[in-house]
Each structure stands twice: as C-alpha cells, then as structure tokens.
C-alpha cells in the first residue's frame, strides 16, 4: 500500500501545493531524525558532557605538574614591637620573586594527596643592593584525613558506572528517537490514509448521488433515500477538508522534528512488508540487563546511597587530619652557593576534632543516611521488577504484532472487496443504503486499522532495540560511533 496521496488532492488543493514535493520512507525519516532531530542533538551534547566529565575525573587521578610564581613589590611603613614594649615604625622597601615547580598526585586508596616540589625565592632590599636567596630544591608533602570521608575512593566506584550509564543512555536515546520518528511518520501516514479515504468516499458519494437522482426521477427510490445520499455527499466533502488539515498538521510536525527548514510538501510511503522474526524472551531479558542504562542507573543509586552513609558516619565521629612535610633547604647571598650545605627540614601537623555534645545531630544524620539507603534499595528493587515486566511485555507484544499486521492487511483487503460488492448490489437495487453505509464504514475502519497496526509494529520494533541495544532482525549488537562525538 502506498500512503502517499498527493495524486489524490482536489484541484483547488493541488493548485495551492504546487511547490517542491519530497517523498520519504520510514528508513529515511529515521536516518534524518537520528542526525537532525532536537532529541538526537540533545543526546549527543548530553553524552559529550558526560564524556568530558569522565575525562576530568580520570585526569584527577593522574600526576599533575604545575608551575607557580607570586612576585610582589612592597613599599610601605610597618610597625615593629620592641623588647621594651615600645613600637617602632620601619619603612619596607623590597621586591620578592619566587618560582615553584610541583608534581601532585592524589592517592585514592587513602584519600590523601602527595606532592613533590622545588622552589627558589629571591628577596631584594631596594636602596641597599642587598639580595638574599632561599631555595628548597626538594620538598615532599603529604596530607590526608585519617578517619574522614574518602571521596576519591567513592568517586572511583561511582564515576565509571556513571560513564557507562551515559554511553548506554545515548544508545537507548538513538533508538527512542527512531521510535519517535516512526510515530511522526505514521501520524502523517494515517492522516494521508484518512485523506485518501475521504477523497475516495467523496467521489463515490458524488457518483451515487448522481445515480440516485436518475433513479429518483423514474420513481425507483424515495425522496428520503435521495436526501440521505445528498447528506452523505456533503459530509464527505467536509471530511475531505478536515482530512487535508490533518495532513498539513502532521506534515508540519514531521518537518519540525526532522529540522527541515525548506518549504517542501512532505509525503510518506509505507511498506506492506514487515520483518518476520520472533525474539526469545530469555535472550532479550539478558541483553536488556547487560545493555540498558536503567541497570547502571540503579547500580549508581545504590553506590551513591552507600557513599552518603559513609559521609554521614565520617562527620559524626572523630575527625583527624595529618600534614607531613620534609625536604632540603638553604639560604644565602649567592644563588648557586645557596644549594651548598643543604639543611634538613621537617614539619608534622596533626589536627583533631571530636564532638562532645551535639544533641544527637551526628547520630541523626547517620540514621537519615541509613534510612535513605534502605529507601533507595527498596525503590531500586521495585524499579528492577518494573523493568523486567516492561521487557516481558514489549517482547510478547512484538512477537504477536507481525501476526496482527498480517490479519489487519487481510481484513483490509476483505473489507475493500465487500465494499465493491455492496456498491454493485446497491446500484443494481438489490441492497439498501444501510448495507452500503455499513460496508463503507468497515472498509474505512479496516484501512485505518492496518496503518495503525504498522505503526504499532515499528514502535515496538525500535522500543525493543532501545531496551536491549540489539538488532534481533540481523542478530547483531547495535554499534554507535562514540569517537566522532568525543572528537567534536
């Protein structure tokens, strides 16, 4: 069945749409949607954001090399407290320059930060030509929280899951875009079908009315039956106008979704055949659990809940931070000589904080976090059940839909044949107008049901692909070019 109906347009309507026409198949619409539609563009940008967030996370676990300098000029008057308690004002007139090179590495399993640095400083006293140097050729620094929340460890568990979720979410969205594009495609196909039906019925009603006029004049039908045919003719004319508006609206919706800027008349052509294959439920379920982003989302929510509980526990008890620093340093009036006879330097700092009386605040925060974790686990269990039920439902519906398409097609052909027979019988005066109207109604309903069954088939087809990230028709996984998005 060809759903394109431009050749059926009334003369007035045809004159109004004599511009460029573009006929699209379902495959062409889906290809354009996955490239140009707002949903596809949003999906690419969402994935790109997730990709760079993950890159930033991975970079935070690698050694970082930095160069720092903080030169300043100081010309001011400052006071100095003398030994007897008096205050003396001293004029400051100096320039300080420094340069520091440091390598910093986060240590995820302890949550600390390790740094190796080398620093050189120069102090010039203006007006005296006095210059001194302070060098620290090698300095090692380590700091961490001893009993606190280790964000590095939890990020190591959460961020890879978040990125896998983003990759799978992009794949799912591309298939959902295909499903949405098929909805717009069949919305236009259905509107075109209704217009084709309306045009056919209008032509038939006009022919029957003209034929009935002749029969009325020779007295073989009543005036009531003639008026009934005239009303039917007028109704069909109104139906054509309504159907044309529906076609225009559906075409505008499709044009908008495909981001087509040109003013072209869009028509779509449906294919009678649909792929004939069954999907094993067990295989679909296993693939859905492996490939669907919802599974990664549920996993991430559970880990996030555990992380929140660990954070609450860490903040409720003893907090301790340690800062260690050791290295070599020296000062002198000559830069090169400053590196001679280097002195050892060590610095150790430990800070402690223990809540003595917080009126149960810390314990309450732990209980809230634990309750939230239990709630998340319950919600994720229910979400998993709903997910599995949805997969089962989609698979069962899809496995039946090809048969339904075949039944709808045969019903459409049978109803069309019945209409032809009923029309001939009415023309021959062997049936009533009620029988003819019934045949017309069944023909129209069967035609619409067939297009609707095709739309349902392709919606289920792409929904199943979105759930499993698998092409069951060709028995192969769906692949997407992530690298092209990551490079842009």
Regions found by a protein language model. Name each.
Residues 102-104, 141, 310-311, 351-353:
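Outer-membrane beta-barrel architecture
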Residues 30-34, 86-88, 221, 226, ...:
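Amphipathic alpha-helical coiled-coil scaffold segments and their short linker/junction regions
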Residues 24, 157-287, 397, 401, ...:
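Periplasmic alpha-helical coiled-coil/stalk elements that build and connect Gram-negative outer-membrane
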Residues 41-45, 58-59, 107-132, 146-174, ...:
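Sec/SRP-type N-terminal targeting helices
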Residues 16-183, 320, 324, 360-363, ...:
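Short flexible linkers and secondary-structure junctions
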Residues 49-52, 57-59, 206-210, 234-260, ...:
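Short segments within alpha-helical structural elements
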Residues 1-21:
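Bacterial Sec-dependent N-terminal signal peptides
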């Amino acid at each position: 069945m060809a759903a394109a109906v431009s050749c059926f347009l009334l003369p007035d309507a045809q004159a109004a749409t004599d511009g460029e026409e573009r006929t699209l198949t379902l495959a062409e619409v889906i290809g354009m949607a996955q490239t140009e539609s707002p949903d596809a563009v949003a999906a690419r940008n969402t994935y790109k954001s997730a990709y760079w967030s993950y890159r930033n996370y991975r970079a935070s676990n690698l050694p970082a090399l930095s160069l720092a300098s903080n030169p300043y000029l100081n010309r001011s008057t400052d006071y100095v407290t003398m030994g007897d308690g008096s205050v003396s004002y001293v004029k400051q007139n100096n320039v300080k320059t420094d340069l520091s090179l440091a390598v910093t590495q986060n240590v995820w399993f302890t949550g600390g930060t390790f740094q190796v640095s080398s620093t050189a400083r120069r102090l010039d006293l203006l007006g005296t030509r006095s210059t001194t140097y302070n060098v620290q050729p090698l300095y090692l620094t380590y700091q961490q929280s001893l009993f606190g929340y280790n964000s590095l460890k939890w990020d190591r568990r959460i961020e890879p899951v978040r990125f896998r979720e983003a990759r799978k979410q992009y794949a799912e969205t591309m298939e959902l875009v295909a499903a949405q594009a098929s909805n717009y495609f069949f919305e236009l196909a259905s509107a075109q079908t209704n217009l084709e039906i309306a045009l056919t019925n209008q032509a038939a009603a006009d022919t029957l009315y003209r034929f009935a006029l002749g029969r009325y004049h020779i007295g073989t039908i009543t005036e009531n039956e003639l008026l009934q045919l005239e009303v039917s003719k007028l109704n069909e004319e109104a139906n054509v106008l309504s159907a044309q508006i529906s076609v225009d609206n559906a075409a505008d919706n499709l044009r908008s979704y495909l981001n087509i800027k040109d003013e072209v008349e869009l028509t779509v052509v449906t294919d009678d055949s649909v792929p004939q294959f069954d999907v094993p439920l067990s295989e679909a379920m296993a693939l859905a659990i492996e490939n669907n982003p919802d599974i990664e989302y549920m996993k991430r929510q559970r880990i996030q809940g555990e992380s929140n509980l660990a954070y609450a526990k860490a903040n409720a008890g003893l907090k301790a931070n340690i800062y260690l620093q050791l290295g070599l340093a020296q000062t002198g009036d000559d830069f090169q000589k400053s590196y001679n006879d280097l002195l050892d330097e060590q610095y150790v700092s430990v800070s402690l904080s223990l809540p003595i009386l917080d009126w149960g605040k810390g314990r309450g925060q732990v209980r809230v976090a634990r309750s939230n974790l239990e709630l998340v686990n319950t919600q994720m269990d229910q979400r998993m059940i709903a997910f599995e039920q949805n997969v089962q439902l989609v698979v069962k519906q899809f496995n039946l839909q090809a048969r339904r398409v075949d039944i709808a097609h045969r019903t459409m052909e049978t109803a069309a044949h019945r209409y032809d027979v009923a029309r001939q019988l009415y023309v021959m005066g062997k049936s009533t107008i009620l029988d003819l109207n019934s045949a017309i109604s069944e023909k129209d309903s069967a035609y619409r049901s067939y297009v609707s069954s095709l739309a349902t088939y392709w919606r289920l087809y792409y929904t199943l692909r979105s759930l499993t990230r698998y092409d069951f028709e060709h028995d192969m996984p769906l692949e997407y070019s992530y690298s092209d998005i990551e490079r842009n």
